[in-house]
């Protein structure tokens, strides 16, 4: 069962357009919360990827963070591939032109 908190996170995440990324911090701010780690847990258990695009969530400094519970390896390579397919370039584990690619919720 998906919690009300997770449902809200997933709904917000689905509003992030292709070609953009957001952060755990931006998601938390949009929810009027400081629960960054809880949002990370919600991302790890995303039942509807890639329709709910958790690959678009990165760390506040533009580095990739994790993907599907992994910090490196094939899962993170998949995250890079998904982002690249959407026009987001990653170099050295960081989103290129991060400030321009960052999606901030209204």
Where do the language-model regions lie?
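Nucleic acid-binding interface residues in structured DNA/RNA-binding domains
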Residues: 1-106
